[in-house]
Design a protein with these regions (language model features):
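Eukaryotic partner-binding/assembly regions in large regulatory complexes
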Residues: 1-53, 57
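Positively charged, polyanion-binding regions of nucleic-acid-associated proteins
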Residues: 44-79
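Short, cationic-aromatic polyanion-contact patches
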Residues: 14-20, 147-171
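A contiguous, surface-oriented mixed alpha/beta subdomain in the mid-to-C-terminal portion of proteins
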Residues: 90-94, 142-144, 172-177
């Protein structure tokens, strides 16, 4: 089953969670986004990276929720590290209540090597992000300008975020899960 929604100038076919025909299964996403020996920790880290990217681009305020035009890959890397470390500092019972095991995701992130040469191997931090960004680009959600290490969102993602995901209830929920203070 799925929903048909119209946002802005586009029509979206949105699969429900138990849909087996549209979208991606957890295993398909794990295979596309993570290294071949990936565990659930790696998969959840990939989802955390995507959520972090969305929160950095969209703030849920005003007529358009978009807060910025572009982001550098290095800045995204720093945001991921900061958010994971902040999440680990919070109480364990808070982690369990929110359903995010920050320590497990931080462990998976720290297990990835750093490579200043721009390795695209999924076993490096840079390669891990590279594969996630390429996946999002193939889905038409971002433009990834590799030469400049720049990430830009597409009109498709902007419309979807404005009309569906970033109503205030959803936005506050995402911020709470990520541990972001917002007024």
């Amino acid at each position: 089953e799925s929903f048909v929604e119209r946002y802005g100038g586009g029509i979206y076919l949105i699969p429900k969670e138990d849909n087996n025909f549209l979208g991606f299964s957890k295993n398909q996403l794990k295979q596309a986004l993570c290294k071949s020996t990936a565990t659930d920790k790696d998969y959840y880290l990939s989802q955390f990276v995507i959520l972090t990217l969305l929160v950095e681009f969209y703030d849920g305020q005003g007529s358009s929720s978009k807060a910025r035009e572009y982001m550098k890959v290095g800045e995204l890397q720093n945001c991921i590290s900061e958010r994971l470390k902040e999440g680990c500092e919070r109480a364990k019972d808070e982690e369990e209540r929110e359903g995010l095991a920050f320590s497990n995701m931080l462990e998976a992130y720290e297990a990835l090597r750093s490579d200043d040469r721009g390795s695209k191997a999924k076993t490096t931090k840079e390669g891990f992000l590279y594969h996630i960004l390429n996946f999002l680009e193939k889905q038409g959600l971002i433009d990834f300008v590799e030469e400049d290490e720049m990430i830009k969102t597409t009109k498709k993602l902007d419309s979807f975020m404005d009309w569906n995901l970033l109503n205030q209830n959803q936005f506050q929920r995402v911020l709470k899960v990520l541990g972001v203070e917002h007024e």
